[in-house]
């Protein structure tokens, strides 16, 4: 499968057309961003680590019966995926309080959330990815009620699979975001799952092992990603 015209360049990935209209190629770059893209740096090995991490997670989800856009890994930093008509909202599942939830509600970071919370955010960097709800999403034509219900169902299924996976590596899956799209009238999981889009802490020390290391200038960002990968069994070589 050969890359053709670049369709889209995001903050950390580039999307390319292929000769098959149903398939795209994602290129994972070394770019790392924060503050809605206002701060961007290059971190060596990041594209390779995130591509392999994502491929591993997508396969685990597929093995659990969750349909994703993942087709196959093409190279160290490229993957073949189904072309989805993306729904412009992010689904965020939180098992513990962190990030914007702490700031909005004055919660203590690390407070357990039982049951896990589920939120929707409109994907728009210029607006700061504002929080929205199902009613807004339906009224503005972003998704149907049935599609939103399926996204919520799948998000909680993903949480069940991945909390167990990370727990086995003595890690806490604090929260994560997912993006979904439509493929031949089916809602399936798109985008990626990597430490860029979730929070992961060491179970014993609560050490942050995710993109918060970049956001908060803690250092050793890729080393943390590689540690997580090693502890859950991601093959990095």
UniProtKB/Swiss-Prot annotation:
* InterPro entries documented for this protein: SAICAR_synt/ADE2_N, SAICAR_synt_PurC, SAICAR_synth, SAICAR_synthetase, SAICAR_synthetase_CS
**Catalytic activity from the UniProt record:** 5-amino-1-(5-phospho-D-ribosyl)imidazole-4-carboxylate + L-aspartate + ATP = (2S)-2-[5-amino-1-(5-phospho-beta-D-ribosyl)imidazole-4-carboxamido]succinate + ADP + phosphate + 2 H(+)
> What Gene Ontology terms for biological process does this UniProt record contain?
'de novo' IMP biosynthetic process; cobalamin biosynthetic process
Q: Give the EC number(s) listed in the UniProt record.
A: 6.3.2.6
Task: List the GO terms this entry assigns under cellular component, sorted alphabetically.
Answer: cytosol
Question: What UniProt keywords apply to this chain's record, in alphabetical order?
Answer: ATP-binding, Ligase, Nucleotide-binding, Purine biosynthesis
- Pathway terms, separated by semicolons: Purine metabolism; IMP biosynthesis via de novo pathway; 5-amino-1-(5-phospho-D-ribosyl)imidazole-4-carboxamide from 5-amino-1-(5-phospho-D-ribosyl)imidazole-4-carboxylate: step 1/2
- Entry's Pfam families? SAICAR_synt
For the protein in the UniProt heading, the enzyme class is ligase
Q: Does the keyword Transmembrane feature in the UniProt annotation?
A: no
Gene Ontology molecular function, alphabetical: ATP binding; phosphoribosylaminoimidazolesuccinocarboxamide synthase activity
So which residues are the signal peptide here?
none
Check the record and name the PROSITE patterns matching this protein.
Answer: SAICAR_SYNTHETASE_1 (PS01057), SAICAR_SYNTHETASE_2 (PS01058)
Q: Does Nucleotide-binding show up as a keyword for this record?
A: yes
Q: Give the family per the record.
A: Belongs to the SAICAR synthetase family.
Instruction: Give the protein name, as stated in the record.
Output: Phosphoribosylaminoimidazole-succinocarboxamide synthase
Q: Which gene encodes it?
A: purC
